[in-house]
Amino acid sequence: DPDLVTSLPKSITADTGMDVLTHALEAYVSNMASDYTDALAEKAAELVIKNLKECYDNGSNKEARERMHNASTMAGMAFSNAFLGINHSLAHKLGAAYHLPHGRLNAILLPYVVKYNSEEPTKFVSFPKYEYYIADEKYSHLAKKLGLKVDTIEEGVNSLVEKIKELNEKLNIPKSFKDAGIEEKEFLAKVDVLADRAFEDQCTTANPRVPLVSEIKQILLDSYYGK
């Protein structure tokens, strides 16, 4: 399989690779997550962090390509059982509206969604598989496994967010929707509809934090301006 993608354009390597990371992180904190999906998601995230930049820089590195394929499969196994979250809800609607690559949209959104999900929810999900809110703890635990600085849960979350931003930058992924070429006036005219539609997306139901439409709109605005 690695032979099939050695000539893949760098931008597609970056976009699809960040989609894999998004699959892993969303499955990891899903309200349907289990011990099985956690193990798959953790390993998938680790493989992406260690191998995606090498695939981007040196597409002919078959070992790195193989590990990214493994990561993609494991992340797929994780989210096919635990489902996804609002990162994909938003990317689905933005992709339909602006025809930008799905993985690129996920990559731009991911730091903002991780930060959002790490905060105490306005209300809990209807059928949580845990007794208290643990998304922030899980993000921090993953950050520790990735070798990031984690003296507190909050620091672990922030370290993970910064690692995602750093990887995006190394892959030449835009920092914001504005940088990705979405025209401001058009975006602001559509943002309320996009927020409503993202709220109704099937992925929203598995997000660890049940979002208000107003909160989804704020994520969109933050992601547009790169705040």
Give residue ranges: language-model regions.
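Gly/Pro-rich interdomain helix-loop hinge
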Residues: 100, 104-186
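Glycine-rich phosphate/pyrophosphate-binding beta-alpha loops
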Residues: 73-106, 201-206
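Flexible, glycine/charged-enriched surface loops at secondary-structure junctions
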Residues: 32-40, 55-67, 82-87, 153-157, ...
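Predominant activation on well-ordered alpha-helical scaffold segments within soluble catalytic domains
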Residues: 18-26, 42-53, 69-73, 87, ...
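Short, amphipathic C-terminal "tail helix"
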Residues: 186-227
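Carboxylate- and glycine-rich phosphate/diphosphate-binding segment that chelates Mg2+/Mn2+
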Residues: 1-82
